[in-house]
């Protein structure tokens, strides 16, 4: 089984948290709401990977004022690729508390939508298992 280390920002701005809706035809959690983030490349430093993933997935106009390592988690997930093939992967999630100075987001093709969500409204979203676990650990669900 392949192993992936994932950097995952829990981005907050003015009391709301950023959720991204995965595209229906790709990813580990197609069509569900998730946190952004992605894999650490070989030889890449963890914070560099976090900043790269944010830039790739959310655009280069989102300004992070603060990045704090928070916790980690792991599990086994079935990834569905765009061509319909599937792969079981051991995932290690490195989760960071992030505070943004703005809300300027330009999502890439991995996502179909995004939302800034107040804590009291998070439970109304179809959150993927990993995001639900993270938000519960944080005391937000």
Swiss-Prot record:
Residues 1-141 form the Nudix hydrolase domain. Keywords: Hydrolase, Magnesium. Its cofactor is Mg(2+). InterPro entries: Nucleoside_triphosphatase_NudI, Nudix_hydrolase, NUDIX_hydrolase-like_dom_sf, NUDIX_hydrolase_CS, NUDIX_hydrolase_dom. It catalyses: a ribonucleoside 5'-triphosphate + H2O = a ribonucleoside 5'-phosphate + diphosphate + H(+); a 2'-deoxyribonucleoside 5'-triphosphate + H2O = a 2'-deoxyribonucleoside 5'-phosphate + diphosphate + H(+); dUTP + H2O = dUMP + diphosphate + H(+); dTTP + H2O = dTMP + diphosphate + H(+). Pfam families: NUDIX. One of its GO terms (molecular function) is dCTP diphosphatase activity. Its EC number is 3.6.1.9, 3.6.1.12, 3.6.1.-, 3.6.1.23. A motif (Nudix box) lies at residues 38-59. Belongs to the Nudix hydrolase family. NudI subfamily. Monomer. Catalyzes the hydrolysis of nucleoside triphosphates, with a preference for pyrimidine deoxynucleoside triphosphates (dUTP, dTTP and dCTP). This is Nucleoside triphosphatase NudI. It comes from Escherichia fergusonii (strain ATCC 35469 / DSM 13698 / CCUG 18766 / IAM 14443 / JCM 21226 / LMG 7866 / NBRC 102419 / NCTC 12128 / CDC 0568-73).
């Amino acid at each position: 089984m392949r192993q992936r280390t994932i950097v995952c920002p829990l981005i907050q701005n003015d009391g709301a948290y950023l959720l991204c809706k995965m595209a229906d035809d790709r990813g580990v959690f197609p069509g569900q709401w998730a946190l952004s983030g992605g894999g650490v490349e070989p030889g890449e430093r963890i914070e560099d990977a976090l900043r790269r993933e944010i830039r790739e997935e959310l655009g280069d106009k989102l300004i992070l004022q603060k990045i704090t390592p928070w916790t980690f988690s792991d599990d086994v997930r079935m990834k569905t690729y765009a061509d319909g093939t599937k792969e079981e992967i051991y995932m290690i999630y490195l989760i960071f508390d992030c505070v943004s100075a703005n809300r300027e987001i330009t999502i890439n093709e991995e996502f179909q939508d995004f939302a800034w969500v107040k804590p009291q409204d998070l439970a109304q979203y179809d959150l993927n298992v990993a995001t639900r676990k993270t938000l519960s650990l944080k005391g937000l669900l």
